[in-house]
Swiss-Prot record:
The sequence shown is that of prolactin II. The gene is prl. InterPro entries: 4_helix_cytokine-like_core (IPR009079), Somatotropin/Prolactin (IPR001400), Somatotropin_CS (IPR018116). One of its GO terms (molecular function) is hormone activity. This is Prolactin. It comes from Cyprinus carpio (Common carp). It is found in: Secreted. PANTHER family: PROLACTIN, SOMATOTROPIN,PROLACTIN. Residues 1-23 form the signal peptide.
């Protein structure tokens, strides 16, 4: 079984785990969510490596700065120590806000992947569709976590995405695809970190053990 097949199998199992959750405790829900977020970040890293395998040098020059990511305006903790100081419901809202913000961008990436000027476009296309499916599954799982936590606040930040095209020429489309993916990879790491902190807190572990 290839690495991609193993990753797909593991994520599929985790997605199915969210289908029937009646009676499942908060600790188990957060464990499943953190495992799925970890797989999501691994998949985005694998996709980035695929793109980098044949990425034109000029693309590095054309690549927008990280501050141009559409989620960069969201105020989030910079490290684990800061995350540990944030209330659980706020931390969960941050993770859910980031997931929601990627619904439209991932739909765009999924629609563009098959026509990229890249020799690995079939693999990239397949993995991008996986990302889109998996982030929807994680979003549904976090809704269950939200309900289980019994929070009275459902304060999700709005992070609109206005781009409907990656560009007209093949280089621009490849560069913008790579840029969006790099933004998602960064955010998927944040989501994974937030969920691991929530899992740690639910298990009543000491902060230094998180």
């Amino acid at each position: 079984m290839t690495q991609g097949s193993r990753l797909y199998f593991a994520v599929t199992v985790l997605m199915c785990a969210f289908v029937s959750i009646n009676g499942v405790g908060l600790n188990d829900l957060l464990e499943r969510a953190s495992q799925l977020s970890d797989k999501l970040h691994s998949l985005s890293t694998s996709l980035t490596n695929d793109l980098d395998s044949h990425f034109p040098p000029v693309g590095r020059v054309m690549m927008p700065r990280p501050s141009m990511c559409h989620t960069s305006s969201l105020q989030i903790p910079n490290d684990k120590d800061q995350a540990l100081k944030i209330p659980e419901d706020e931390l969960l809202s941050l993770a859910r806000s980031l997931l929601l913000a990627w619904s439209d961008p991932l739909a765009l990436l999924s629609s563009e992947a098959s026509s990229l000027a890249h020799p690995e476009r079939n693999t990239i296309d397949s993995k991008t569709k996986e990302l889109q499916d998996n982030i929807n599954s994680l979003g549904a799982g976090l809704e269950h976590v939200f309900q289980k936590m019994g929070s009275s606040s459902d304060n999700l930040s709005s992070l609109p995405f206005y781009t409907s095209s990656l560009g007209q020429d093949k280089t621009s489309r490849l560069v913008n695809f790579h840029f969006l993916l790099s933004c998602f990879r960064r955010d998927s790491h944040k989501i994974d970190s937030f969920l691991k902190v929530l899992r740690c807190r639910a298990a009543k572990k000491r902060p230094e053990m998180c």
